[in-house]
UniProtKB/Swiss-Prot annotation:
Subcellular location: Cytoplasm
Name recorded for this polypeptide: Ribosomal RNA large subunit methyltransferase M
Biological process annotations from GO: methylation; rRNA processing
Family: Belongs to the class I-like SAM-binding methyltransferase superfamily. RNA methyltransferase RlmE family. RlmM subfamily.
Active site: K301 (proton acceptor)
EC number: 2.1.1.186
GO cellular component: cytoplasm
Subunit structure: Monomer.
One GO MF term: S-adenosylmethionine-dependent methyltransferase activity
Keywords annotated in UniProt: Cytoplasm, Methyltransferase, rRNA processing, S-adenosyl-L-methionine, Transferase
Organism: Xanthomonas euvesicatoria pv. vesicatoria (strain 85-10)
Amino acid sequence: MSGLVCYCRQGFEPELAAELSARAAFVGIAGYARTQRNDGYVLFVCDEAAQLAAKLQWRELIFARQKLVVIAELKGIDPKDRITPILAALDGHQRFGDLWVEHPDSDAGKPLAGLARSFGNALRPALRKAGLLTDKPQLRQPRLHVCFLDGDHAVLAVADNADSAPWPLGIPRLKLLPEAPSRSALKLDEALLTLLTPEERDALVKPGMRAADLGAAPGGWTWVLTRQHVHVTSVDNGPLREHVLETGLVEHLRADGFHWKPAQPLDWMVCDMVEQPRRVAERMATWVREGWCRNTIFNLKLPMKKRWDETRLCLDLFEQQAEKSLIVRAKQLYHDREEITVLAMRE
């Protein structure tokens, strides 16, 4: 088959399928999505897979943790010899710079983790012997992915290192530090890692910058910013953890974060308030339109139904009401739940 395989959060396959279908149609490439709920991945079948992959940048896809171009789908693999059919499917292919053997992050896929680990150790030397894999990882070469969907069913796919998630399964392995005020700190950590390039992070998140955290309590997102030596005004009627205040970088204002506005423009505004997504999108747009912040990261809590439609509506609403020339990226992060995280920055 020809097409793309994209990983996603279990249960969000319909949203990813709808997104891929809409984006493919927008760039004029015909295709269809193949998936089932709770699979943890979507296969988008199309004849122009390489062209579609080039037009759908990984950072621009909202519900895709990873984006890969399919080489082959192998079914009915003999468990006693999985290597031979894989080598046959790759015959004549260019050399790869790395190998990742994976499985979907789903209830059905997680039991395949042991197989993925052990099979990777067996496949790697076989690929090198066949001249299909470099001796050491080479970022300039495409990366081979073998994704086991079952013990006898695998998808072979290729990733461009410059346009794919740099983590197996598309999941950054972040550790929740003991001093983190809440697990939500991982969301902002992941957002900064995923939505910004390394060059953008260096340029846009600098010591001495000023930020506001709306709905800050107990201080997870504020704490992440202080670790970057950013001065934070934390706005919430609720309390912050004492050690967050002790950094000397935090001013806690007991106020309604949804209505507060700064006295002077800030470098950043971040917001993880539990509110209706359209209301949040409109308020975030006001912050950008009025020049109260240069850049923002905020979360949109999605409804149980029609989540792709609501996502498009909220992002369109935000961009229309912001009335600024912006770079907008959105992702359903690994540490997100029924929500997406949005980055908006000045061009």
